């Protein structure tokens, strides 16, 4: 397929702008480009067809089953889009006088209040723009707390070996040293290893609950107690809140600070690079260090300061608020229960088909299969199975993560999938398992029906080409 630049022809454009009806405001010459930008020149019909073709090649939750583990690819109600498109929200400017945007301030305050209730936290800020940004903000709160108390030696953040990769990255960015905590044979935090790792240098522990293999940390009260007795704080990574929202609260488990992913748990479209939203909640004793909120205004003298310009990715907040108001308190819990039910249903179907779960028994909202045995028996890898799913119109699950499981495939079906969809997916995967044993070569070559097959991902990562180079230089 040609790139948009390759379809460009000199003089063929869509410059049908009306005459200027306001005073011209030219860019000062010292800031102006020396050469005109080399934008593609293309007619409107060709432009439309180009992007329609690209759209047909894309795959989203409205196109089919999308069980991408740890990403919560649930259906996003169109009500949120309608609310986010209201002129009173889209036509504002962050520098407007406060008295002209009272409705927007109220919407943010209502969202903060709702998120505080769901998480069991006392304060919430909407400033962080995404999940990892929320992690970074929460870690800065922990750092500021210890510095304020004169505990400058607390420089270590404990991170389980099953954690999301952003956890150690965020801790390092915040200036901490990362210490790894191994999982036990059941896929849970090893309590003895945690006790041994805690000490006078412990600033805190980052933990997801349910964890990244889809299991609830049944010793969570003991875990938070161990860290607190060592003088550290406990951070809740809200990546998996969809499994427990409305049912259990991180604040009641002993967590001191948390972030949420509005673009996952609260039904805002995601997966295309943004925008996201990663609000941070905390207990009262950390509130003096917060960057500010719609409910409580700007931060005080001990605040870590603003972590982004203005208030939030505002329209993501509006979508999340619409989702919460549409569900109401009771149905928020129903959504979480539906996510857990669907995950266990699909897990059982796949086990009956012959797949091996990394951890037997009930799971929460997601589960991990290990294809290590299948690869030894047939040579068919997790990558082969994932690629074969594309031929049947199913987006692959997360591959080779978490790292503690060999040949891992992580499924998260979410609450918005019907049983018939799960049955169909199970049937597809059962057929792939049959082919792995009868005709493994067909899987090594999969996918067979997609425009893009198996790109060289290693070369793409090491030598990325992210801009167009004109043939003439």
Where are these regions (language model features)?
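A short, small-residue-rich loop immediately preceding and capping a beta-strand
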Residues: 122-128, 156-159
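Conserved phosphate/anionic-ligand binding catalytic regions in large, soluble enzymes, centered on
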Residues: 59-79, 127-138, 266-281, 285, ...
